[in-house]
Every structure is written in C-alpha cells, then in structure tokens.
C-alpha cells in the first residue's frame, strides 16, 4: 500500500472546519489526473519488461520500490512548502515509479481474472471519484469530521492487519491467503472509498491554494490505493489468493 501518512495528517489538521484553500481542489485535480496517466505508463513499462526480460524485472522492481518510498517523502516535503516548480518533476517520477511497482499486481490480476479485471477496477475507481467530488464538497462539518476520524482509525487497523498478514505468512504457509486476503481486500476497498469522500472535505481545510501539489499527492494516493484494493479483491474472489 503506497504511503498515506499525509492523509492522516490532513485529518488532524481538518478538525477545525475552517477553509484554508478554497480553490485548492480545482487546482489539484488536473495533476491527480496527470499522475494517473503517468502511473498507467509505468504499469505498461513494467509489463513490457516482464514480457521481454523476466529475469531483469525483479532487481529493477526493488530499486523502483525503494526509490518510490524516498521520492514520496522528498516530494511531499517540497510540495508542502509550496515549491511547486521543484515538486512537479519529483511527483512525475513518483507516479511513473508507482506504476512500475504495480505492474506485478496488474499482471497477476490479468492472469487470474482476465484483462477485464483492470477495466472493472478502473471503472469502479472512476465512479467513486465522480460520486466523491459531488458529495464530498457538500459534506457538513459534523459528517466530514466523523467520517475523517473513522477513516483514520480504519487506516491504522488496515496497516496492523497487513503486518499480521505478512508476518504470519512468513511462519505459517498460506496464513495470509484465502479468506484472510479476501477480508483485507474487502476492508481496504471500503476504507478507501470512504477516504475518497474525505479527501474532498479535508483538502480545502488542510492545504492553502499554493499547496495544490501536496493536495494532489494525497488525493492521488487515495485513488491508487483504492485501485489496488479493488484489484486485490477481484483476485481474491477469483481464487488468486489461495495456495494449494
């Protein structure tokens, strides 16, 4: 799951309900869309490499994963300072690397449920975005803060569950697959649907208009995570998480 620490920070800063950046959402949305396009390009690059040079994919995957984590924190810090001319190329590289690191999951989804799984996940993510953009902007402070708190606690619970899944799988073969994977994938999907609505509430209460790239990064992470968990859910429902 890509980093989401800035989302939790946004929840804390949005508790008072006052608008900090009334135009930040509209300024951020084109960059969220651009990030998604770049991510798709990174996925296609990863799939092409897996097809042409499977042995070379994993070493590059680990390099990309480490670089992706470092880039996230650097880009977030620069974007929060409003230094958008420097943040933009960093976020461009981050989006491409994110796509590359997701290519293995996409390949697994295609192998398990067919190419239609990618279209289903993308369509569901897009529908969530449209609904969240309409409802999230009109959310009252009481509802917005309550949902923000619930999503924040949910993210904490999800991280703990995923750590248990990873550690348990190291000691007990098959521990993290099957029903456990289905539960995590389903919970993650519901959680990030909620986070999508929260984003439209918290962003103008957290970021100034000059911090639109920081806001775009947070929203981008929400939709990337939603896409990931929908794919994981599709894979689990099609038996891809089972081990004989």
Predicted regions and their residues:
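A hydrophobic alpha-helical transmembrane-helix feature that marks the membrane cores
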Residues: 1-244
């Amino acid at each position: 799951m890509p980093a989401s620490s800035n989302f939790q920070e946004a929840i804390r800063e949005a508790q008072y309900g006052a608008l900090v950046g009334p135009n930040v959402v509209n300024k951020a949305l084109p960059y969220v869309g651009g990030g998604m396009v770049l991510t798709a390009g990174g996925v296609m690059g990863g799939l092409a490499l897996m097809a042409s040079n499977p042995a070379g994919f994993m070493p590059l995957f680990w390099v990309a994963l480490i670089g992706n984590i470092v880039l996230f924190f650097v880009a977030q810090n620069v974007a929060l300072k409003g230094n958008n001319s420097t943040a933009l190329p960093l976020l461009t590289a981050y989006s491409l690397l994110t796509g590359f690191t997701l290519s293995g999951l996409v390949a697994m989804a295609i192998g398990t449920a067919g190419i239609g799984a990618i279209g289903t996940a993308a369509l569901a993510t897009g529908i969530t975005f449209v609904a969240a953009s309409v409802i999230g902007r009109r959310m009252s402070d009481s509802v917005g803060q309550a949902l923000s708190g619930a999503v924040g606690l949910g993210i904490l619970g999800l991280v703990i569950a995923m750590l248990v899944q990873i550690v348990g799988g190291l000691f007990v073969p098959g521990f993290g697959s099957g029903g456990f994977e289905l539960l995590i994938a389903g919970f993650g999907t519901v959680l990030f649907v909620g986070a999508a609505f929260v984003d439209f509430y918290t962003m103008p209460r957290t970021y100034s208009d000059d911090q639109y790239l920081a806001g775009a990064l947070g929203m981008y992470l929400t939709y990337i995570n939603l896409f990931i968990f929908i794919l994981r859910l599709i894979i689990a429902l099609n038996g891809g998480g089972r081990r004989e």
